[in-house]
Design a protein with these regions (language model features):
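Short, charged, surface-exposed hinge/linker loops at domain edges
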Residues: 1-19, 23, 52-77
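Short aromatic-glycine-(Arg/Gly/Cys) micro-motifs in beta-strand/loop hairpins
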Residues: 22-37
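A short, exposed loop/beta-hairpin motif centered on an aromatic-Gly-Thr core
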Residues: 38-48
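Gly/Ser/Thr-rich beta-alpha loop segments that engage phosphate groups in nucleotides
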Residues: 31, 41, 71
Length: 77
């Protein structure tokens, strides 16, 4: 029997709001990280590029983990 947690679709996870942390990199540019998704981070020269890339990284992280059948954590506020 599948419970509600197991029945969640990839689209469900893609619509969740995972908090993003952005900070300046000591070598220049910015680093963005989603702490709820282990290893989901990116580095770019501008804040705009950093935001765009962390959103792409989040989607790829979620798609990969979902396809592997692993547990996806929910966002922590």
């Amino acid at each position: 029997m599948i419970n509600a947690v197991e029945a969640r679709t990839l689209n469900y996870y893609l619509t969740l709001n995972y908090p993003i942390t952005i900070y300046p990199d000591s070598d220049g540019g910015y680093v963005a990280q989603i702490k709820d998704l282990a290893g989901c981070l990116t580095q770019e020269e501008t804040i705009e590029e950093t935001i765009q890339n962390i959103n792409e990284a989040r989607d790829l992280w979620l798609e990969t983990v979902y396809e592997l059948g692993r547990k996806i954590p929910l966002p922590i506020d």
